[in-house]
Amino acid sequence: MAESFEQRHATLIREFNEFLFEHPEFTEEIPQGATVVIQVADDQEYNAWSRALAEANREPGRPIVYVHVDALAPRRSRLVNPQIRLLR
């Protein structure tokens, strides 16, 4: 089970970083050096795992910021009008 949590965590962190890149004003709410903990609605097992990971890796005196998300939307392709041509 831990491996799937690790995979989900990597995906959520990547998506959160992309979100911050697209919405830089959001970074103003995150103190410098803070440990960011992503919490997903309706996934208490992952949330507990994520909090434990953050506490284990947190440097003393550093703040913790919880980022609550409702869900992760399906990834979409950004290809426009792809066409497949078979060469024989």
Each PLM stretch: what is its role?
Residues 1-88:
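Terminal, compositionally biased segments used for targeting/anchoring and flexible tails
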